[in-house]
A protein has these predicted regions:
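Exported/extracytosolic protein signature
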Residues: 1-171
Length: 171
């Protein structure tokens, strides 16, 4: 009742917002070295895994097959990140292709599902190699260079050097 003893009527409606549980994961792979890498160069990769959902993730597996990285993170809370590093040494096969692409994959159990559903992501990083240079150098020297007469024996030494950056065959 109001101060004059009149009945007062009204309604109060409550709004309830339900947040639906959702699992999400993100992986980012980076490197500082991106161009003109040579055979034997070591590329250091940083792999950052982040829980972008609104539930804690468990059994998080991070795989980078090229670098033989296989890590497991037991639990990754909402909004949290884990950072891993791994390395790869450039091989001649990479030089022959002109670049090397490396992929990081991540998966985790999806706690919002009753089955074996996983949340997954992957990211890659490509580095370019120096230009392939197939080159050979041949040097020929004699053990005697002057004062020769007909019938003298001369011994030659031939040195063949691969001064390129790829293996040569059938030389």
């Amino acid at each position: 009742k109001d101060p004059k003893n009149n009945n007062v009527h009204g309604e109060d409606k409550e709004t309830v917002t339900t947040i639906v549980a959702g699992a999400g994961i993100d992986v980012l792979k980076t490197t500082e070295t991106k161009e003109n890498v040579k055979v034997g160069d070591t590329i250091i990769y940083t792999i950052t895994v982040k829980n972008i959902g609104n539930v804690t993730l468990t059994n998080v597996k991070v795989d980078d097959d090229e670098t033989n990285l296989h890590e497991e993170i037991a639990e990754l809370a909402v909004g949290k990140t884990e950072t891993l590093t791994t390395e790869y040494t450039i091989k001649e096969a990479d030089l022959l292709k002109g670049s090397f692409t490396n992929i990081a994959k991540v998966e985790a159990d999806d706690p919002t599902k009753d089955d074996d559903t996983k949340v997954t992501d992957q990211d890659d990083e490509t580095v370019t190699t120096e230009e392939m240079n197939a080159h050979i150098k041949v040097e020929k020297t004699a053990d005697v260079t002057s004062g020769l007469e007909v019938g003298d024996e001369v011994t030659y030494t031939i040195v063949v050097t691969n001064d390129g950056n790829v293996t040569l065959y059938n030389v």
